[in-house]
Amino acid sequence: YWLIPPGIIQHHKPEKDKFYEINVKFIEIDNLNTQKKALITKFIGSHYMPHKYEKYVPTKKSIVSYFNGHNNKSYLSLMYDKTNLSKLIGMMTTRPLDIIIDNNTLQLYYVDFLCVHKNERKKGIAPRVIYTHYLNHRHKHDNMIFLFKREGPVTLIVPLTIYNNYLFDVSRWSKVTTFDEP
């Protein structure tokens, strides 16, 4: 709102530039083999949400099923270390999503699991993964709207919404609690 009015930032398809990374592999999630599914599950479990009071321990089924059953394809970008091509150092996923704003339905891609190896942070990996994924996606699709989830403090990007998450430790709850349903 402050610098650029709401709308599409880039109408033309992007070109490879200094942020494009050749070591990022762009994959349709439907085409992942069992080995890659295990790799991304382990990577997300080890390097996504590394906060003191939060722990995300996904299963392969919980990750892969998140991308099934959509009207369009879901995508994954994997960035490997330049000196050790078997070492995954960054990743990002996108899945199709329909949102309704002011009674207008928009088709977009929701960005999730943007994740960088703990030992590789603060090296500019995330922007390169994002740009390379964006470029590859735009050359495959006409859809040019991407929605990012931002965890932490608000930045210069104007948020669509702001909300709080709450965590509850249910491991010590002594009985099953039921809630009234309408």
Task: Describe the role of every protein-language-model region.
Residues 1-182:
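An N-terminus-focused feature that recognizes amino-terminal "leader" regions
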